[in-house]
Amino acid sequence: IIDGQWDQNYSYAEKKDLLMKLKKTLELKEFNGDLIHFVDVLLQNVEVLHRKDTVGSLLRDQYMAENVSWILQKVQQRGNDCIFISRHNEHIAKWGSYDSMWKLLSNQYRYYVIGTNFYKTRCNLPEGNHKRTIQTFYSHDLLAKTTKLASFKMCWIDFSSLEEGTEIKRHADAYTYMGTLGESYSIMNRSLPPSYRMFQPPTTLYDNMIYVSNASPTKIIE
């Protein structure tokens, strides 16, 4: 794996075969079950990247939900009953048009969701061939813009504390654009801004949100 991407010299079948052999070797040598699970996660990654259809997206959320449950079980064995996880907004949102990670987990666990959004962001994104590009995006989110105009670098809003009838409550309940950037860059992001935005009411998706006025790109340390 190079910069988080599989070496393209290996085919799907070769990657899967290599990992299956590694898993079998670990099982025969009776290695720690955690290590075997990590190999299973790599197998999941190979499978998801191989599937380019809608089934692949659904499979990804299914695997994420399974892995979160696995992590929680490990934490519970150590005497704790809560975990804090970080995921893309669409995977943790309380509502979605497909079986997202949250939808799957919400059938088993209580779940408190913190969303994030930006007014302006510069992102360091992979664009294929192990190259990266820094691109600028705007969410067009009114609450994020308010954070910027109020001169806040960051702002946290607990939606449960908003009073009915107030302007901020109306904006939080209303449909608005929110940034939803993924882990890669496409020319479509530049020519078709809705490709990196979703149009939903913030209070429908999250229990509260963190707004960032100007987000800076991640610095990759070689």
Question: Where are the language model's segments positioned?
Answer:
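Structured catalytic-domain cores with a bias toward divalent-metal coordination
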Residues: 1-222
